[in-house]
């Protein structure tokens, strides 16, 4: 299988970002699991994992600190566009944050 290309599109601000450093952990017809480092340095978390539930239209992310402690869970409502091995995840601006 060809390597996946992942993008995140936001509408506010209007941007489409290649998730070039995300590592794909698993792929199925229903879900894509990734692990990642932050794009911009932060003091509260440094890395995490995300599961994109493609058919259901949401993403659940686990945000972790330097010691792998869970800082919070983050749920995004998304719409997924697929073109070959390229996925664009459109953030529909309805989010839920669950703090530990």
Please identify what each model-predicted range represents:
Residues 23-24, 50, 93-97:
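Short, surface-exposed charged micro-motifs
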Residues 26-29, 68-69, 98-99:
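A short, structured loop/turn motif at beta-sheet edges
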Residues 18, 69, 88-90:
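A short, structural micro-pattern
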Residues 1-48:
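Charge-rich, low-complexity N-terminal segments
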Residues 4-7, 60, 96-98:
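Generic preference for hydrophobic/aromatic residues in regular secondary structure cores
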Residues 74-100:
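Conserved, surface-exposed functional patches that form binding/active-site neighborhoods
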